[in-house]
């Protein structure tokens, strides 16, 4: 599979552990690809839910996916500052159809003022039982929550305002070509 290039548009598909399609984002612009990571941007991107409902993202958001970490990061650029929505999820897989990952329900939200919240713990526990998450998977996900919180606290990668500014500026340059 050829890696997408800067300026290409890709589809993103999230699945649940049982293989069911959860959500699809159409036309995410790729800003950078490396052997292990893809950085992109969603800006007024069409999102389709598994039940067929559709909506459009409200603000530009830098998205970060990695082949080794069990999370992905969405940096939402808003008037009052950058806030983050982080999905605990499998490392991504890329094929000719889309960038794909499994969403494991647990989420970390970081507000523009720095407040952090772990979300959807009950949903995670419910799906863990229903979809038979293994003990190994449970351990991996909980360890990756710790890694993610360390990244947040250290303002590493996507959690650095300089990172967000650089990639947003690059998006504007590509958009205005």
Swiss-Prot record:
Q: Provide the cofactor list for this protein.
A: Mg(2+)
Give the disulfide map: none
Gene3D superfamilies found in the cross-reference section:
FomD-like
Q: Where does Mg(2+) 2 bind?
A: 105, 107, 120, 123
Q: Which UniProt keywords apply?
A: Hydrolase, Magnesium, Metal-binding
Key word Transmembrane helix present: no
What GO annotations for molecular function exist for this entry?
Answer: magnesium ion binding; nucleoside diphosphate phosphatase activity; ribonucleoside triphosphate phosphatase activity
Reaction(s) catalysed by this chain, per the record, are:
a ribonucleoside 5'-triphosphate + H2O = a ribonucleoside 5'-diphosphate + phosphate + H(+); a ribonucleoside 5'-diphosphate + H2O = a ribonucleoside 5'-phosphate + phosphate + H(+)
Query: EC number(s) for this protein?
Result: 3.6.1.15, 3.6.1.6
Q: What class of enzyme is it?
A: hydrolase
Residues the entry annotates as binding Mg(2+) 1: 87, 103, 107
Q: Which residues form a coiled coil?
A: none
- What InterPro entries does the record tag this protein with? DUF402, FomD-like_sf, Ntdp-like, SA1684
Where are the active-site residues found? 23
**Family the entry assigns:** Belongs to the Ntdp family.
- Function text: Has nucleoside phosphatase activity towards nucleoside triphosphates and nucleoside diphosphates.
- Give the protein's recorded name: Nucleoside triphosphate/diphosphate phosphatase
Organism in which the protein naturally occurs = Streptococcus gordonii (strain Challis / ATCC 35105 / BCRC 15272 / CH1 / DL1 / V288)
Q: What is the lineage of its organism?
A: Bacteria, Bacillati, Bacillota, Bacilli, Lactobacillales
């Amino acid at each position: 599979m050829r890696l997408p290039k800067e300026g290409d548009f890709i589809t993103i598909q999230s699945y649940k552990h049982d293989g069911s399609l959860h959500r699809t984002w159409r036309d995410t612009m790729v800003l950078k690809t490396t052997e292990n990571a893809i950085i992109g941007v969603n800006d007024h991107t069409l999102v389709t839910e598994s039940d067929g409902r559709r909506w459009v993202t409200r603000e530009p958001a830098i998205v970060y996916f990695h082949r080794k970490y069990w999370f992905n990061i969405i940096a939402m650029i808003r008037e009052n500052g950058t806030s983050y929505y982080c999905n605990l999820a499998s490392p991504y897989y890329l094929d000719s159809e889309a960038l794909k990952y499994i969403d494991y329900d647990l989420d970390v939200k970081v507000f523009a003022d720095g407040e952090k919240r772990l979300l959807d713990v009950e949903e995670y526990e419910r799906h863990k039982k229903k979809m038979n998450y293994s003990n190994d998977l449970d351990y991996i996900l909980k360890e990756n929550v710790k890694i993610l919180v360390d990244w947040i606290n250290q303002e590493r990668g996507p959690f650095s305002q300089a990172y967000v500014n650089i990639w947003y500026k690059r998006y504007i340059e590509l958009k205005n070509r």
